From Swiss-Prot:
InterPro entries: BTB/POZ_dom, Ion_trans_dom, K_chnl_volt-dep_Kv, K_chnl_volt-dep_Kv1, K_chnl_volt-dep_Kv1.2, SKP1/BTB/POZ_sf, T1-type_BTB, VG_K_chnl. Inhibited by 4-aminopyridine (4-AP) and charybdotoxin (CTX), but not by tetraethylammonium (TEA). Inhibited by dendrotoxin (DTX). Inhibited by tityustoxin-K alpha (TsTX-Kalpha), a toxin that is highly specific for KCNA2. Inhibited by maurotoxin. Inhibited by kappaM conotoxins kappaM-RIIIJ and kappaM-RIIIK; kappaM-RIIIJ has much higher affinity for channels containing KCNA2 than kappaM-RIIIK, with the exception of heterodimers formed by KCNA2 and KCNA7 where the opposite is true. Gene3D superfamilies: 1.10.287.70, Potassium Channel Kv1.1, Chain A (3.30.710.10), Voltage-gated potassium channels. Chain C (1.20.120.350). Residues 1-160, 244-254, 311-325, 418-499 are cytoplasmic. Belongs to the potassium channel family. A (Shaker) (TC 1.A.1.2) subfamily. Kv1.2/KCNA2 sub-subfamily. It catalyses: K(+)(in) = K(+)(out). This is Potassium voltage-gated channel subfamily A member 2. The gene is KCNA2. Residues 1-26 are annotated as: Disordered. Changing residue 324 to T: Found in a patient with drug-resistant epilepsy; likely pathogenic. It comes from Homo sapiens. It is found in: Cell membrane; Membrane; Cell projection, Axon; Synapse.
Amino acid sequence: MTVATGDPADEAAALPGHPQDTYDPEADHECCERVVINISGLRFETQLKTLAQFPETLLGDPKKRMRYFDPLRNEYFFDRNRPSFDAILYYYQSGGRLRRPVNVPLDIFSEEIRFYELGEEAMEMFREDEGYIKEEERPLPENEFQRQVWLLFEYPESSGPARIIAIVSVMVILISIVSFCLETLPIFRDENEDMHGSGVTFHTYSNSTIGYQQSTSFTDPFFIVETLCIIWFSFEFLVRFFACPSKAGFFTNIMNIIDIVAIIPYFITLGTELAEKPEDAQQGQQAMSLAILRVIRLVRVFRIFKLSRHSKGLQILGQTLKASMRELGLLIFFLFIGVILFSSAVYFAEADERESQFPSIPDAFWWAVVSMTTVGYGDMVPTTIGGKIVGSLCAIAGVLTIALPVPVIVSNFNYFYHRETEGEEQAQYLQVTSCPKIPSSPDLKKSRSASTISKSDYMEIQEGVNNSNEDFREENLKTANCTLANTNYVNITKMLTDV
C-alpha cells in the first residue's frame, strides 16, 4: 500500500486555525530568522521577531540597524560596551525589562540606552530602579517680556546682567545679616543709652535692665541700613511675583516664603512702633509689645536662608535633607526611645543618693539627650555605680543610633552633588560643541516658546541639534555600506530582505 505525500502547504491548510489564504510560510521563516550581532568582538545571536518587538529602537528598526551591517561577515557590528549589551538584549527578550549589570557604571549604561534608542520610557524606568529622583520641570512665562525678567531674577547663570543682580542681592543679604548682628553689641547699645532725646528708652523687668530701642530713630544708622535692605528685598520680591508664570505656585515655593518672612518683620515692627501711644506706658502694655517685637525681630535671622537661592551648596543640602526625611524621622524616633529609657534608668539608679542631680525623670531628659549625642556638658552627672553604668550604655547606644542613618544621608548627598556637577559639565560641553546656527533651528525655536523647561530638556535640545549633523554622516555611511554590498555581492539577498 502506497501513501502519497501531500504538499506541506496543503497540510498546513488542513490544520485548524491555519487558513490557506492567511498563512505565509516565507513571512514565518523571516521572523524566525537568526541575526548575528557583534559587540566589539563578542557575538550574540537572536531572532528577528525578538528585535521586532520594539520597532522604534535602533535594533528593532531594519533601516536604522542597516547602517551597522557588515556584508562580508553577514553580521551587525557595534563598537560599544560589551557587558552592557547583555542587559540590552534581555530588554528585547523579556519584552521591556531593563536591568543594569553590576559591573557596568551608571553613566556608561545610560549612554548605551541612548545609543540603542530604547526610548524615554525605558530611561525613566531605569532611573527609577536606580533610585534617581526625577528633576521637576521649571515653568517659564509665556509672555516674552515676563520671561526675560523672570530669567533675569531667577536664573543668575542665564546672562551677564542676571549675574550682576545676583551679586547685588547676595551683598544686600550679607549687609543685612551683619547689621542685625552688630546692633546687639554693647558698644552700640551704650551709645543708644544716652539717646533719650531721640526716643530710645530702657525698661526694667525683674531687677534687670533691658536695653531696647523702643521707638525707632529715623536717623539711626542701623535703621537706615535696614530700610535700604528692605527696599531691595521688596523690589526683588514684587518683580518676581509679577513676572512669575504661576501666581498660585509662587507662594508654594519655599524660597518665596523665606522672602516674605524676611520682609514682614520690618513692616510689623515699624507699624507697631508708629501706632504706639504715649499713654500705653501707664497701662502696662509696653512689656507685651516689647516681647512681641523681640520675637518678630528674631525672625530677621532667617534672611540667611535667602543665600540658598544663589548657592548651589545650600540647595544640594536642602535637597539632601528633603530626600532624607524618612531617615531623619527614624533617627529622632530612636533618640526619643533612648531618652525615655535611659532617663528612667538613671533616675531609679540615683534615687537613693541624697545629692542626686536627677530629681525626676523629665529633669533627666536633658542628661540623656546630651549623653546620647556624645556632647557631655557635665552639668548633670551620675555618682553611683549603677548610674555610671547606665551613662556608659547611654553613650554607646547614642553612637550606634546616630551612626545608623548617616550612610543613607551621605549617599543622598553624593547623588545630588554628582548630579549637579555632571549637569553643569554636560551643559558646558554642549554649549562648546553645539553648532553656531542653533538660534535658527526650528526645534529650538519651538522649545523656546514652550511653557516649561528643565535642565534635561535643555540638554535634549542641544543633543537634537548635534544629532542633525550626525544624521547626515549616517546617511553617507548607509550609502557607503550599500555600495560596498553591491560591489562584493556577499549575501545581497539577505541584506535586501532585512531592509
